[in-house]
Design a protein with these regions (language model features):
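Early extracytoplasmic/lumenal segment of secretory-pathway proteins
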Residues: 23-87
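Mature extracytoplasmic/periplasmic domains
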Residues: 252, 257-315
Length: 340
């Protein structure tokens, strides 16, 4: 019966394997690497279409798409925070695509299509939090942070890690979120103080949860689901919370690339990723974002968003290429250039 149901679901999305010459779709994936790999493997098993996929942070993927604009090397980009996707749409690097099954998606996902002119879909959502290792902080007699304001306390000097907003879409979400929460001037003053306590800015926002779990960082600022993933993987001293003042969130992006060589195959991979089968891969890969497709029961391991104080994040403004560039340049000049 399960095989029949799976077959029916794939048929509805036009995804059953059919005899063909060697078919290949090229993709950039910016979410959890295990999820990227599992999705590609399962899609190939289901359809017979080979996936050649490169794992890149969203900032890196955007830079590569710009460099390859005259001769695109990939067909599809999926996963990772949506702001860089919106910047790519603005720079005419993407092809518009509005799936026929938007009725199966949550409203926040459909709004991403509407806002972007159908150039960017919302694959999942998740929110920014702070995670810590109780054991690591306990050895140093440090209390766990609960609010953004706590993180600038000098007692946390050398204890906090986050990603670099130039290479990580998640870190850019943090910076843009602080600006919207506090106002730009106050946010930059805050980030200057926070900078003094940062031990390192990593390339990807996926590093913080792992480094906190392994005691390599006492506190990490990233998407909260990552810390929950580590806790469920056996690192029971990992804890996390959403900042008490309010926090930003992401809409994970998915988009077709303008000028793609394998556009029709890319649509098949896209549709499969948005189907219940494809969306369910995330939790199987222990990647616990909230999926966009509402037609199936999401895994109980996925953190609830109940009680989290979310800001009214302006995706259109902060996803704009010029605004993103301005903020990143200002952050480099006024924050990252300071000594720690």
């Amino acid at each position: 019966m399960k095989k029949l149901l799976l077959s029916a679901a794939l048929t509805a999305f036009g995804l059953l394997a059919t005899p063909a010459l060697a078919q290949q779709v090229n993709a950039y994936c910016s979410t959890n690497q295990t999820w990227c790999e599992m999705a590609a493997s399962e899609f190939t098993k289901a359809t017979g279409i080979k996936v050649v996929q490169t794992h890149l942070g969203t900032g890196e993927a955007l830079a590569r798409l710009k460099a390859e604009a005259a001769n695109p090397k990939t067909d599809l980009w999926w996963g990772g925070t949506g702001d860089p996707f919106l910047a790519a749409a603005e720079e005419k690097l993407l092809d518009a695509y509005r799936p026929a099954y938007t009725k199966d998606l949550y409203d926040w996902s459909v709004r991403q299509y509407d806002m972007s002119g159908n150039f960017v879909g919302a694959f999942y959502t998740s929110f920014i939090g702070m995670g810590w290792n109780e054991e690591t902080l306990g050895k140093k007699k440090l209390a766990a942070p609960k609010c953004w304001a706590d993180l600038t306390d000098p007692k946390y000097k050398g204890e906090i890690e986050m990603a670099h907003p130039g290479s990580s879409g998640g870190a850019y979400t943090i910076v843009a979120g602080l600006i919207q929460l506090m106002g730009e001037d106050a946010a930059f003053e805050y980030m200057k103080k926070l900078h003094k306590n940062i031990t390192s800015y990593t390339k990807s926002s996926q590093a913080q949860a792992k480094n906190v779990a392994r005691g390599e960082a006492g506190i990490g600022i990233s998407f909260l689901f990552g810390f929950e993933e580590e806790r469920q993987a056996g690192f029971k001293s990992v804890r996390a919370t959403a900042p008490c003042e309010g926090t930003a969130y992401e809409l994970g992006g998915i988009a077709l690339i303008k000028g793609a060589r394998n556009g029709e195959l890319a649509k098949k991979y896209y549709d499969w990723l948005m189907s219940p089968v494809g969306q369910g891969i995330g939790a199987k890969a222990n990647s616990l974002q909230n999926p966009a497709n509402k037609t199936f029961k999401q895994d109980a391991k996925i953190p609830t968003m109940d009680g989290v104080k979310l800001i009214n994040y302006d995706f259109k403004k902060y996803g704009a290429s010029a605004e993103r560039k301005r903020i990143l340049e200002k952050w480099e000049k006024e924050v990252n250039s300071l000594p720690r």
